[in-house]
Amino acid sequence: MTSPTVSDAASAPIRTVPIAAIATAPGRGGIGVVRVSGPDVRAVMQAVCGRLLPPRQATYLPFLDADGAAIDRGIALWFPAPHSYTGEDVLELQGHGGPVVMQLLLSRCLRAGHGIGLRVAEPGEFTRRAFLNDKLDLAQAEAVADLIEASTEAAARSAARSLDGVFSQTVHALVERVIHLRMLVEATLDFPEEEIDFLEAADARGQLADIRARLDGVLAQARQGALLREGLHVVLAGQPNVGKSSLLNALAGAELAIVTPIAGTTRDKVQQTIQIEGIPLNIVDTAGLRDTEDEVERIGIERTWAAIARADVVLHLLDAADYRAHGLSAEDAAIDARIAEHVPPGVPTLRVINKIDLAGAAVPGRVDAQPPEVWLSARDGSGIELLRAALLEIAGWQGGGEGLYLARERHLSALRSAREHLTIAADHADQRAQSLDLFAEELRLAQEALNSITGAFSSDDLLGVIFSRFCIGK
């Protein structure tokens, strides 16, 4: 994406009403920020700061109320359009981060800007304006929210790369190749009488194969980026007292769940997000599965089945001594069957044989069974690394987060759609005499799918959904 210049008429910001919001998180903090963006913001600056400020310089001064008394003292920053986050005139007021002070400062800005139509910003509206004014493309705008919400260091670094435009540049490179191939097809359609065969001369089939191969690489990397963003939802299930809470504590490296030898100690689900190699894992410890007359425990068991229905992977825990001596019990076989009924299609189950430290000669290990098994001891940690490795394998993590960009399911869907259209295009290329128009159309649809990632082609409905999930001050 080419940065706009002052002389470029196309870089002029879209005319909108001015907006304001507290840009920092709710609560108390050392610093709080009120952001104002839009036309005629100088009027707010003059009223609140008492004077006009030099562009892009930090100025320490009092923030004034309508009577000229100081609300707070802090730093004011003035960014004239188009050289600002939104591409509009932007005023940022950095004061002390108390909620009362911030609300007073925001209210003062709104009153000072009443005559110019200043209003409170909607969620994500600052970033939406940055997108509409070509300061960010859509993938970069989404990366702003992903960076804020990142739950691991790897996710944060990948989001930062997306914000820098790494993902967008990769998609743009694919689009350029598709456009070039489309030009060859259109030339062949428009000039059929020419002696030169544009497609044969340019090796159109070879170009298409190259585009598909590059797209496969982007899709594989995007899947890894999506895993960094979304993580894995892991549910611990099994009969009471098989060590589910102990396993949660072992994976988390902290005493998060109460552990006692009394069956039914856990009556409601306990959730904790941990990370393995930068992948966030949302681990859910659940109530033991059994028939019970206890109303509270029964509700907990119902929530267990609800959690299983939303899982990305289910760990069915069994007692190693019982399993080694007698195999799968009727109760555990019934649990296996019910898990299969509740999990979404394609969601794997991993059998975790726990308490090997109490099972004689049992040793930690992985068994290639159906479902796969991991033998471990949550109490002394034996085999925990094997379980971590199994979870990464199930997730499809290939390691090496360096260079990855964060991706969303929306991006994966667009990439898969583009690949499908390119596959159909390849079929038409093999039957070019009858299908040249269809070849061109599939290339157009592939380009459209890729453009939807960066927002070069996006519906208003899609934009509304994306930006509504931002925090107010972004």
From Swiss-Prot:
Keyword Heme: no
Cofactor note: Binds 1 potassium ion per subunit.
A Gene Ontology cellular-component term: cytosol
Function: Exhibits a very high intrinsic GTPase hydrolysis rate. Involved in the addition of a carboxymethylaminomethyl (cmnm) group at the wobble position (U34) of certain tRNAs, forming tRNA-cmnm(5)s(2)U34.
Official protein name in the record: tRNA modification GTPase MnmE
GO biological process annotation, one example: tRNA wobble uridine modification
GO molecular function: GTP binding; GTPase activity; metal ion binding
EC number: 3.6.-.-
Main location: cytoplasm
Cofactor: K(+)
UniProt-listed PANTHER family: TRNA MODIFICATION GTPASE GTPBP3, TRNA MODIFICATION GTPASE GTPBP3, MITOCHONDRIAL
Binding site for (6S)-5-formyl-5,6,7,8-tetrahydrofolate: 35, 92, 135, 474
InterPro entries from the UniProt entry: G_TrmE, GTP-bd, GTP-bd_TrmE_N, GTPase_MnmE, MnmE_dom2, MnmE_helical, P-loop_NTPase, Small_GTP-bd
